[in-house]
Amino acid sequence: MSFAVRDLKREDRPGWENLWAGYLEFYEAKMEPVTIEVTWSRLLDPSEPMFALVAEDSETHDLIGLVHCVIHRGTWSISNLCYLEDLFTAASARKRGVGRALIEAVYARADELKCARTYWLTHESNETARKLYDQVAKNAGFIQYRRDTP
């Protein structure tokens, strides 16, 4: 399978929605339609501190992977940080280098933006993804705690 990684475009909406639905299903998550709409708008707005990349099958032109990143300030560096918030590969394209290519494209963009670090979280049970992540980054050993606003 041949594919290319590129920036998300407005005409990608149907393919992006399909991948996004697969990502939410994978994590057994539900999202309000308004949140999906705002997320889509933010990903395409150049004034937002975020970006999205997609992997496109070179033959069918179907989207087979996505990654969303947020660029933000931190307290441990004067340079911005790149938070890789979402990464998903279509089931039909897994174990073909799509995830790795998306991460490498994020690294390249973060380097262009002079980010001090690129980082992300994954669920501890996501063993398949963790095998890849262990090859392309180091596990910082932190445990995430959170409180959702009531």
Which residue stretches match the model-derived regions?
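Residue-level recognition of the GNAT/N-acetyltransferase active site
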Residues: 72, 85, 90, 94, ...
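Conserved active-site alpha-helix within GNAT-family acetyltransferase domains
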Residues: 100, 124-143, 147
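Acidic/polar helix N-cap motif
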Residues: 9-12, 90, 126
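Conserved GNAT acetyl-CoA-binding A-motif
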Residues: 111-122
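Charged catalytic carboxylate motif
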Residues: 15, 35, 101-102, 128
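Acetyl-CoA-dependent GNAT
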Residues: 3, 7-13, 18-79, 85, ...
